[in-house]
Each structure stands twice: as structure tokens, then as C-alpha cells.
Regions:
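Catalytic center-proximal scaffold of phosphoryl-transfer enzymes
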Residues: 1-130
Length: 130
């Protein structure tokens, strides 16, 4: 790691609220040890630092390695419900997951559709999410 990246990483690991996400990323170039062109772009954002990581996998090791340097006793990672983040939190008691509001909103909408008797209640919560 170069000095600027290392300093940014150290700064990020001192913070307490993060956003995490990942998406497929197609790499055209052949890379030793990787079959196929599907890689993953991971993003870990805190208040002052945004890290973009390219990884050949979408596995739980990527966030576990990234957050290995956390310094705070309690942090929150806002993310989707992907199992890699659940695995991260299971392995680190200082990490609390806060699932993305968009996913929570979908759950409320599904409840309203499936249980009309709870429609008023669910739409009340949806209004608070906005």
C-alpha cells in the first residue's frame, strides 16, 4: 500500500459509521489466477474516506479484510442484506449492521400487499422512512 492510501485507510478505521456495497465489474484483461472476467467492485465509505476495492470474489473475506483494522469499539455498517456483511458482523461483535432503508421500505410494502389489515400501519412507517 502506498503512503497516501495507507493514511486514508488508517483515518477510515478511526471512524464509526460506514456504508458498504459491492457490484459486478467486468474486467477485459486476463489476470493470472482468475478465470473469467467477472470481478467485483466493493465500496466502503465513511464520513471522510471512500475506498474502492477490486476483488476477484464477492466473498465475505473482502469486508473482513477491509475492516480488520477498525479501532473503535462500536461501529455501524449500513449495507444491504448480503451474507458477506452478516458474516462480517458475526465475526466482529463491535460491528452492528444497519440495513438499507430501501430494503426496509420494500419489506413494509410487501407487508401492506400481503396483509391489508396492516396497510395503514405499514404506510405510516413508510412515511417515517422518507
Amino acid at each position: 500500500m502506498n503512503h497516501a492510501i495507507e493514511a486514508a485507510y488508517e483515518k477510515q478505521m478511526e471512524e464509526v459509521v460506514f456504508n458498504g456495497d459491492e457490484t459486478r465489474w467486468f474486467v477485459i484483461e486476463q489476470i493470472d489466477g482468475k478465470t473469467g472476467h467477472r470481478w467485483y467492485l466493493w465500496v466502503f465509505r465513511s464520513v471522510s474516506v471512500i475506498f474502492y476495492l477490486m476483488a476477484p470474489t464477492r466473498g465475505a473475506d473482502v469486508p473482513k479484510i477491509h475492516f480488520a483494522g477498525i479501532k473503535s469499539l462500536e461501529i455501524v455498517v449500513v449495507c444491504d442484506r448480503y451474507t458477506a456483511y452478516k458474516s462480517l458482523a458475526s465475526a466482529n461483535e463491535e460491528i452492528t449492521l444497519a440495513f438499507c432503508w430501501a430494503y426496509m421500505r420494500r419489506d413494509f410494502l410487501d407487508t401492506a400487499r400481503s396483509y391489508p389489515e396492516f396497510e395503514e400501519w405499514t404506510f405510516g412507517w413508510i412515511e417515517m422512512i422518507r
